């Protein structure tokens, strides 16, 4: 079941890739993918290229994939291990969701962080109290790690 679904998503991604994103298997292992997200324009991540790993569970799509950034990023919802705080990767997962939709959700999280549910409270505090400093630090990390 999982393999069939993963193959179908791979074909759909090839036919109709989401804007600013790409993803595909690492070598022959269809359960382990690498994804790329381009820093969205008009965000402090603009110009950066961010890499992520995707691990599909054997009972996919009934359980969510494990998605993590391998590129460091300054963001209140993404910690230094690359873990992402995004409801659809946890409690709000649904088998109707696809990797394409997950990547688009992560893109929109980059444009629009959720400081009220942070993985990194200190970054969330700066985001809420000093947006200019947040943008400056996010741009600096993007230049340092994603270019």
From Swiss-Prot:
The active site is at residue 85. SUPFAM superfamilies: UBC-like. One of its GO terms (cellular component) is cytosol. The keyword Nucleotide-binding applies. It comes from the Eukaryota. One of its GO terms (molecular function) is ubiquitin protein ligase binding. Residues 1-147 form the UBC core domain. Belongs to the ubiquitin-conjugating enzyme family. This is Ubiquitin-conjugating enzyme E2-17 kDa. It comes from Drosophila melanogaster. The gene is eff.
């Amino acid at each position: 079941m999982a393999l069939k679904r993963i193959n179908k998503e791979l074909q759909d991604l090839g036919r109709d890739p989401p804007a600013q994103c790409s993803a595909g298997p690492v070598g022959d292992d269809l359960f382990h993918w690498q994804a790329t997200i381009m820093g969205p324009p008009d965000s402090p991540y603009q110009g950066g290229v961010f890499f992520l790993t995707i691990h599909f569970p054997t009972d996919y799509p009934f359980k969510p994939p494990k998605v993590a950034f391998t590129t460091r990023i300054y963001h209140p919802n993404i910690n230094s291990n690359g873990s992402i705080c995004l409801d659809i990767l946890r409690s709000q997962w649904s088998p109707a969701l696809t990797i394409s939709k997950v990547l688009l959700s992560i893109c929109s999280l980059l444009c629009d962080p959720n400081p009220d549910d942070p993985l990194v409270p200190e970054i969330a505090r700066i985001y809420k109290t000093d947006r200019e400093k947040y943008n400056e630090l996010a741009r600096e990390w993007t230049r340092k790690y994603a270019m």
